[in-house]
Amino acid sequence: MSRPEYPKIASREQWLLARKGLLAKEKALTQQRDALNAERRQLPMVKVEADYRFQGPEGELNLADLFAGRSQLIIYHFMYHMDRGEGCDGCSCVVDNIGHQAHLHARDTTLVLVSRAPLADLQAFQRRMGWSLPWYSSLGSAFNYDYHATTDEQVAPVEYNYRDKAELERLGLNYHVQGEQPGVSVFLRDGAQVYHCYSSYGRGLEMLMSSFHYLDLTPFGRGEGWDGMPDLDGKGMHWTRLHDEYQQPAAVHDCCASTKP
């Protein structure tokens, strides 16, 4: 790999002038983000009518049970590949970025993973990764299909990231037409009644990736070869791996992160 291009060298005075110019833009973006967050909070909510069932260490649960007594629930739709017997590299990177749950719990919020796979398989992979986040199986439930975390036109009309099958195919996003998909959904509970408030997919999930935000502070960025970044390993956006496999040779597969030993 050739040496990435470094930023030009400047005096401290020149650097400070450029930094203050960037700071003004950063502050404007922060204000825009605050306004967007406020608008997100004001979205209407939809009553959840279906009686979804999940499997967890405690046995069978319904959607309200996943709140663990709190008012707000965030579900990360984790792609688990039953054919490979392991989780998606990209989704695994998301979970690796999740910190201690106490801070969310202090805001009356529970965060869990949900996957359409056997619970025993999820638990085995969870042990391998060393995660403690609650993880539930939606296998046998319509939950994944209703919230577009699994696409299969034999079960339900295809939709991902608010695009139907025709639009996905027109945009060349054929990998979203069939199979497991990543996403995040937010629910609010009032007693036993649950409401759906928000779902996001695709690059909307980058807000969950603290490692990406750290890398965005650096001259090489994410090293993915777009928007002026160098491509540090020739894999573009598909460089993430399971955290215990970075030292192994990589091969291409069809997951959202496409390297695999």
Model-predicted regions and their roles:
Residues 115, 137-139:
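Residues at the C-termini of beta-strands that transition into short coil/loop
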Residues 106-122:
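Catalytic nucleophile loop
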Residues 1-73, 78-107, 124-130, 134, ...:
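Non-globular targeting/processing and membrane-anchoring segments
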